[in-house]
Amino acid sequence: MQDQKAYQKLVESLNQHSYQYYVLDDPIISDPQYDVLYQKLLRIEDEHPDWILPESPSQRIGDEPLKEFHTVRHAVPMYSLDNAFEDDELKSFLKRIEEKLPDQKSLAFSAEPKMDGLAINIRYENGQLVQATTRGDGQVGEDVTHNIRPIYSVPLKLFGNNWPEVVEVRGEVFMSKSAFEQLNEHQQEIGGKIFANPRNAAAGSLRQLDSKVAAKRHLSFFLYGWGELSDDWQLPQYYSEMIEQLVEWGLPANPQSEIISGLEGMFAYYEKIQAKRSELPYEIDGIVYKLNDIKLQQQLGFTARAPRWAIARKFPAEEVWTKLLDIEVQVGRTGAITPVARLQPVSVGGVIVSNATLHNMDEIKRKDVRIGDTVIVRRAGDVIPEVVGPILTQRPENTQLFEMPQHCPECGSDVVKELDKAVFRCTGGLVCPAQRKRALHHFVSRKAMDIQGLGDKLIDQLVDKGWVKHPDDFYHLTVEKLATLERMAEKSAQNVITGIQASLETTLAKFIYSLGIPEVGEVTAKNLANHFKDLNAIKQAEFEELITLNDVGEVVAEHIVNFFKEPHNESVIQGLLDAGMHWPTPETTLVNEDSPFANKVVVLTGTLSEMSRPEAKVLLEAQGAKITGSVSAKTDYVIAGEKAGSKLTKAESLGVAVLSEAEWLAMMPQQD
């Protein structure tokens, strides 16, 4: 597609699909279909960087991190809300309004869950998102535009065309429960900071100078109001009507919102939302009631800090004390060892809790939690029970300090602590039951052993039946055995066995990669193979030699040493060799160190006439080059084919050497 109007239509279509998915929760195409369209968009923009629209989905994430945050004064102050913690306080609120509006017989309120997030002001000018600001002190906030743009529920351009020249939308940025769990799981795996709750995680994400970090954390947004509007814009009669208008322009509102009447309506709505609180996919900490009539809002006005026409009815806190009976450990699918508190069962927020996370050893030491303590337990996020800390005044004399086990409770392999990280990890990657399925999925993957016909579901079935525990077990399967599986005909079974046997002929680099050594990716595996040229040499390599290799730092070197030191892993490797696993002799994998591309970082862009990009990648890697997908100051060469786009532009701006296809081929060493 080379038509600019068609490109514009594609941008419009992708934005509409994002709206259907993130705002309406009603997608009309599948995720893979969206991905196809998005990749198509990226290809067009790579070829035609001058076509790129500011509202394109590709423009949500910036290239360069900010150096610092800048303050912004709000055009209209961002007020807080008064809180009500008891029913009597809600009654007093309603009574004050009724006294100030004696002519109003029945007052309608908009009621909505109070999101446990961060208030944000998003400014649109001529329909385009131009700035996003935190509440700050209500008068001055911080510019966080770069971290709001990656939120897919926030449109970069408003829908329709009937919006005012200036419109400021106000709402809450939050992190869903599922996104929060995924983030903490990732933080646990890498030994990073564990967040106490989704609100803290969302706040930490907005405080990132690099938008790429915030983008990975999957923040969400619900609007709750507006700030500055163009003078010529006529507000509707009701608050709910203005919210509906903002939704029509592409912004998401909380679907749980309702219009209620009087004190009975307030109580009924509170009870209804509190009852479904744990089922909601996000955190809430109360209910917000707002007078629905905008003219009556204006008549009541504001105090120094809050509107007189709105109030937040807060939910009660959910923390209790109980006894910490023991601390045990669980082994995650990546081998991370996580301490878990075993508690005297206690009701927290209506749920019986007997286990709670302690995150990692550093957290246990920081909180000084000991076995036998009386501890505070919180249902962090209403879902994940967490030990907040001990009640020191209740500490008995016979408490025990917890020590991380030296051997994995699942497989007996050594447990090691990663350098400069909080995480402890089991080294039995090939044999540990807790890591088994993940290790086997990786072993058969396309860039590893590339075993045709062995999909994840079939592997899970083989593991569940006890037929496959370790990678070498694949090579003892038979057609007759596989054919007994449900939905597995003899021909299909034969195809699987053929694929397994074909994988016995591989390369040293693929074999190393297939082992699933932590932090050892495809490039590192190739560097190891090219440097040592022999499996035994890699297995016997010392830490000091490993860290001299390209792409191998101290952490990776430690993982490699620990992996090959573990006898269980050695047993599986020997089993694979006994099954007939082999690769070409070292001479055929030697890298020409005299090649101009040896140990160089190379980027391919545009269309090549002599071969495809994957074919070019193979040729360059054979010369010792490292192929990357983006241009940076560390790039040595950019090889530019026809219709090279933004990568070529960036290379020229950074002063990176650019080669045409002909120039590159001329530099390649001639084959004997």
Curated annotation (Swiss-Prot):
The keyword Ligase belongs to this UniProt entry's keyword annotation: yes
CDD domains registered for this protein in UniProt: BRCT_DNA_ligase_like, LIGANc
UniProt-listed Enzyme Commission number(s): 6.5.1.2
Record key words, sorted: DNA damage, DNA repair, DNA replication, Ligase, Magnesium, Manganese, Metal-binding, NAD, Zinc
Listed cofactors: Mg(2+); Mn(2+)
Reactions catalysed: NAD(+) + (deoxyribonucleotide)n-3'-hydroxyl + 5'-phospho-(deoxyribonucleotide)m = (deoxyribonucleotide)n+m + AMP + beta-nicotinamide D-nucleotide
Keyword NAD annotated: yes
GO BP annotation list: DNA repair; DNA replication
SUPFAM superfamilies recorded: BRCT domain, DNA ligase/mRNA capping enzyme, catalytic domain, Nucleic acid-binding proteins, RuvA domain 2-like
GO CC aspect terms: cytosol
Annotated active site: 114 (n6-amp-lysine intermediate)
Ranges for domain BRCT: 592-672
GO terms, molecular function: DNA binding; DNA ligase (NAD+) activity; metal ion binding
Residues given in the record as Zn(2+) binding sites: 408, 411, 426, 432
SMART domains cross-referenced by the UniProt entry: BRCT (SM00292), HhH1 (SM00278), LIGANc (SM00532)
Residue sites binding NAD(+) per the record: 31-35, 80-81, 112, 135, 172, 290, 314
Cited function: DNA ligase that catalyzes the formation of phosphodiester linkages between 5'-phosphoryl and 3'-hydroxyl groups in double-stranded DNA using NAD as a coenzyme and as the energy source for the reaction. It is essential for DNA replication and repair of damaged DNA.
The family this protein is said to belong to: Belongs to the NAD-dependent DNA ligase family. LigA subfamily.
Protein name: DNA ligase
